Amino acid sequence: MPKRILQGVVVSDKQEKTIVVKVERRFTHPLLKKTVRRSKNYHAHDETKAFKIGDTVSIEETKPMSKLKRWIVLPAAQAQG
């Protein structure tokens, strides 16, 4: 099964080697037929501390690294390609 890749915005970089990424998804509400936005925060591993608040990043699913961390940040060159 392929690993999931999501794109989002960094909302926190205060932890050591960890960033919090807000990922937004859009879907059509089944009853109201209106586009709804929902967001979720993911803790991702950032080994180099290269990303700051407001940066757009791609994260990839990986094995659990801690209680909350199950994602790693993709390098900028790989994220765009």
UniProtKB/Swiss-Prot annotation:
SUPFAM superfamilies with a match to the protein in the record: Nucleic acid-binding proteins
Gene3D superfamilies linked: Nucleic acid-binding proteins (2.40.50.140)
Entry GO CC: cytosolic small ribosomal subunit
Record flagged with keyword rRNA-binding: yes
Function: One of the primary rRNA binding proteins, it binds specifically to the 5'-end of 16S ribosomal RNA.
Quaternary structure (record): Part of the 30S ribosomal subunit.
Protein name: Small ribosomal subunit protein uS17
Originating species: Methylocella silvestris (strain DSM 15510 / CIP 108128 / LMG 27833 / NCIMB 13906 / BL2)
Lineage: Bacteria, Pseudomonadati, Pseudomonadota, Alphaproteobacteria, Hyphomicrobiales
